[in-house]
Amino acid sequence: MPSRAAILPDAAYRNLKTATAMKSFHKELWMDVPERMGFVNITRDVEAALAESGIREGLCLVNAMHITASVFINDDEPGLHSDYKRWLEELAPHAPLSRYRHNLTGEDNGDAHHKRQIMGREVVVAVTGGQLHFGTWEQIFYGEFDGRRRKRILVKIIGE
């Protein structure tokens, strides 16, 4: 059986041989939201991490490292954030605590786990020319659903 390189066109093989090694960079951001539920625009923090990484082309993963928090992309418009809070509370109300079997363990955050599930765990954004490659109005947000304690966000950037 021929080697993989043998079945590539000459130009593709030359590009493989001259490719640079991919860089990997990570940074942790810390959040301390004083309310039970809140949204924080972290776009500038992620942009600062990207600048620090020196990576010009690649991918940027931003991940909430707690099971009652989320990272998502949307518009930074206060009415939308208010709508999200109302909608999430309608879908997974905090009270009554007895609504959630999870709370039988002594916890009081069963709703926060559901809210996180709805809003998602992480986002991945393309990096182009050393910038986050967003669509119009897109911003990165941290969503907190069981606040009042310090939590961590992972920013992982890979590329060249």
PLM region spans:
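Active-site histidine-anchored catalytic micro-motif
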Residues: 2-160
